[in-house]
Each structure stands twice: as C-alpha cells, then as structure tokens.
A protein has these predicted regions:
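Single conserved hydrophobic/aromatic residue that forms the stacking wall/gate
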Residues: 1-5, 9
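Conserved phosphate-binding/catalytic region of the ribokinase-like
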Residues: 40, 54-55, 59, 63, ...
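Conserved beta-alpha-beta core of the PfkB/ribokinase-like small-molecule kinase fold
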Residues: 12, 18-91, 112-113
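Conserved sugar-transfer catalytic core signal across GT-A, GT-B, and GT-C glycosyltransferases
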Residues: 4, 34, 130
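Generic structural signal for beta-strand residues in well-ordered domains
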Residues: 1, 13-14, 106
Length: 186
C-alpha cells in the first residue's frame, strides 16, 4: 500500500473518533504522528505516558496532547521534578501544562487523582477498597475517563467515574479480567 493511501486511511480512521487515547508501548514517532493528525481535526487527544518514558517526551508530541494522565513516577520523569506531596505535584503539573497541555491528571493510587484544568486544581479522593492487584489500575482509569468524557461528563465527574472503575479493578486479580463491566460502575 502506498504511503499516500495509507495516510488517507489512517486519517479517515481518526476522523471517526471523538477521542484518541494513546500510550507509549507504540513507537514515539507513531504516537506523535497520530496526535498531530487528531489535533488537526479537532479531536481530543489523551496520552497515558506508560510505560514510564526513559527520556523527555518530544515537545511536538506534548503540544498536541489535550489531556495527559501520568502516574506519579511518569509525572516526575516528564517534569524532571521529585513529587513528595500535593505542593510538589502541583508544581510538576504546572510545568507539564506549560508544554501546551490544557488538562493534566496525575493518578496517585490510594491517594486519588490530582487534576489541573483552566488554571484550577481539583483533587478527587480514591475510593477505599482492599486492593489485591493493581496491574490494570491505570489502564482502567484511562478507559473509564474516555468513556465518561465521550458521554459528555465534565472533567470532575469523568474522574470520579474513572476512579470507581479503577477501584473495582484493583480488587480483582489479573489485567483484562479485572476491568469492570459498565453496570458495575454505576
């Protein structure tokens, strides 16, 4: 297949979406390319920078991301700052946001999530559960957030929905099998 035909196909696939979510198990060049295409078409771009990057993420990638969802370790790598408390987390978020990202959500496990949007911070506490396996916690959170946002929920309500989904997943062993069904999250 020619490169031009391939580009048209990829662009059509992305244009059908309202949200594009990516992570870093795909080559960074591909992630950057997809983010640029989606952003150009006005599609919300969400990046979960996992697995944790081994180097700084390219500015041309970050400039095309609308929502970044790192965990604490990933936020430390991206910002170059050590996160020890809420204040250092906020400082790291401000730095990350300065790269052109309008919304940053740091997931903090049992401490909940800290979100930054429109120059405002919102802390969403975690649901209290007995965690047995955190393997799919981050992926479940990101998937839940995408579902809620695609259904028109505001950021705070979307994070609460994502947190519920993630809280359920950590009470079960395994990865995919731990992800809750929609009816379990309501």
């Amino acid at each position: 297949e020619s490169s031009a035909a391939s580009d048209v196909y990829k662009r059509q696939a992305i244009k059908q979406a309202s949200i594009v979510i990516m992570q870093l198990e795909t080559p960074i060049e591909s992630v950057t390319y997809a983010a640029k295409m989606a952003k150009k078409d006005g599609i919300t771009v969400i990046l979960n920078p996992a697995p944790a990057p081994t180097q700084q993420l390219p500015d041309d990638l970050l400039a095309n991301v609308d929502i970044l969802i790192p965990n604490v370790t990933e936020a430390e790598i991206i910002s170059g700052m050590h996160i020890t408390d809420d204040e250092s987390a906020k400082e790291a978020i401000r730095y990350i946001s300065s790269k052109g990202i309008k919304t940053v959500i740091i997931t903090m496990g049992a401490k909940g999530a800290l979100a930054y949007e429109n120059n405002e911070f919102t802390h969403i506490p975690a649901f209290k559960v007995e965690a047995v396996d955190t393997t799919a916690a981050g992926d479940t959170f990101c998937g839940g957030l995408c579902v809620a946002l695609s259904e028109g929920k505001n950021l705070k309500d979307a994070i609460i929905f994502a947190s519920k989904a993630s809280s359920i997943s950590v009470t079960r062993m395994g990865a995919q099998v731990s992800i809750p069904l929609r009816k379990e999250i309501q």
